[in-house]
């Protein structure tokens, strides 16, 4: 990894430099674990006390927090965004999921693969698939018949893309993600389940990121649609005919049931479950482990669930919860007695 001087980093971040611009930075670290040569950042004031004890050679801070640190510092408007940009510069992740076309890859003669694309070992690309410029497909992946993958998209290892799925440009799919598998569609006839073929597909826009082991089901008739600039964390389940609009972020282990529509620029916390056929308007934040059983029509922050407590207190609360109906009746009766 290349090292950078504090002056170079300040220029990259458009930051105000206070301190030794010639200082060489070798790594980004947290305030708690930083050592000499490291740069840290303060993005949450609850960690402000760590500024007094950190061993970091430099710290990225806001103007409000700058007086609390006497060492080398870069003053910026948004330390977390600046950290993100610096992390991109100093990223040690391998740049390529694959290089060239591996001899063990199996590419159908009718598939179209750009000369600049890279296909990893043991990957299979089926008939009529279109792999555009600078696409990287990691080893042991499967690209089904008629799939289209836009330029600059990267698939890490063991990714499965079912038939006729379309993925836009500059997307990132982490390992073991599955796109276009059958939606959960069945009809019941006298106790027997009859499978409903899922005739739609999955359409993914540009600059979408999909986490490891996340599954996105194909539509029953219409397509499942993930619009551009959506980010989805690991181990999420996106059911058939869901539509997620641009700029939305979905955290890990979230489940969107069939035909859910999520608006633009929403944030959905981890392990949230949204019931089928619900819609969520633009600009909604849903906190983790919420259960959404009705559509949300107004922007804002929404929560549900019972926060943790001791088992003893939880048992007491649940006992009261079971008696709510009886308690309501008793309160109403008391109110009637106290009426003039």
UniProtKB/Swiss-Prot annotation:
GO biological process: lipid A biosynthetic process
One annotated GO molecular function: N-acyltransferase activity
Presence of the UniProt keyword Lipid biosynthesis in the record: yes
Record-given protein name: UDP-3-O-acylglucosamine N-acyltransferase
GO CC annotations, alphabetized: membrane
EC number(s) on file: 2.3.1.191
Active-site positions on this chain: 240 (proton acceptor)
Coiled-coil intervals, chain numbering: none
Quaternary structure and interacting proteins, as annotated: Homotrimer.
Alphabetical keyword list: Acyltransferase, Lipid A biosynthesis, Lipid biosynthesis, Lipid metabolism, Repeat, Transferase
Catalytic activity, reaction form: a UDP-3-O-[(3R)-3-hydroxyacyl]-alpha-D-glucosamine + a (3R)-hydroxyacyl-[ACP] = a UDP-2-N,3-O-bis[(3R)-3-hydroxyacyl]-alpha-D-glucosamine + holo-[ACP] + H(+)
Pathway info: Bacterial outer membrane biogenesis; LPS lipid A biosynthesis
Family, similarity comment: Belongs to the transferase hexapeptide repeat family. LpxD subfamily.
Function: Catalyzes the N-acylation of UDP-3-O-acylglucosamine using 3-hydroxyacyl-ACP as the acyl donor. Is involved in the biosynthesis of lipid A, a phosphorylated glycolipid that anchors the lipopolysaccharide to the outer membrane of the cell.
Disulfide bonds: none
Gene this protein is translated from: lpxD
InterPro entries assigned: Hexapep, LpxD, Trimer_LpxA-like_sf, UDP_GlcNAc_AcTrfase_non-rep
Pfam families listed in its UniProt record: Hexapep, LpxD
Gene3D superfamilies: 1.20.5.170, Hexapeptide repeat proteins, MurE/MurF, N-terminal domain
Classification via SUPFAM superfamilies: Trimeric LpxA-like enzymes
């Amino acid at each position: 990894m290349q090292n950078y001087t504090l002056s170079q980093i300040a220029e990259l971040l458009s930051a105000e430099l206070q301190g030794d611009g010639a200082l060489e930075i070798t790594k980004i670290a947290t305030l708690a674990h930083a050592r000499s040569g490291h740069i840290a950042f303060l993005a949450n004031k609850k960690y402000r006390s760590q500024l007094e004890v950190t061993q970091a050679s430099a710290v990225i801070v806001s103007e409000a927090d700058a007086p609390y640190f006497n060492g080398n510092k870069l003053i910026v408007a948004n330390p977390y965004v600046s950290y993100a940009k610096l992390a991109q510069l100093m990223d040690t992740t391998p740049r390529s999921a694959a290089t060239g076309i591996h001899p063990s890859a199996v590419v159908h003669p009718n598939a179209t693969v750009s000369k600049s694309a890279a296909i990893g070992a043991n990957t299979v690309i089926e008939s009529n698939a279109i792999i555009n410029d600078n696409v990287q497909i990691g080893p042991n992946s499967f690209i089904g018949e008629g799939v289209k993958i836009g330029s600059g998209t990267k698939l890490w290892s063991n990714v499965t893309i079912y038939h006729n799925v379309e993925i836009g440009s500059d997307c990132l799919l982490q390992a073991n993600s599955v796109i276009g598998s059958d939606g959960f569609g069945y009809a019941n006839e006298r106790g027997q389940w009859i499978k409903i073929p899922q005739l739609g597909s999955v359409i993914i826009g540009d600059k979408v990121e999909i986490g490891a082991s996340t599954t996105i089901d194909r539509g029953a008739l219409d397509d499942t649609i993930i619009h551009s600039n959506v980010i989805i964390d690991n181990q999420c389940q996106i059911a058939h005919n869901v539509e997620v609009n641009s700029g939305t972020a979905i955290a890990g282990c979230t489940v969107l049931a069939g035909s859910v529509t999520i608006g633009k620029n929403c944030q959905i916390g981890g392990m949230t479950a949204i019931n089928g056929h619900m819609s969520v308007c633009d600009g909604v934040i849903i906190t983790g482990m919420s259960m959404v059983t009705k559509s949300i029509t107004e922007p804002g922050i929404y929560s549900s669930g019972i926060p943790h407590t001791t088992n003893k207190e939880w048992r007491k609360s649940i006992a009261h919860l079971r008696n709510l109906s009886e308690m309501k009746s008793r309160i109403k009766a008391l109110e009637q007695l106290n009426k003039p």
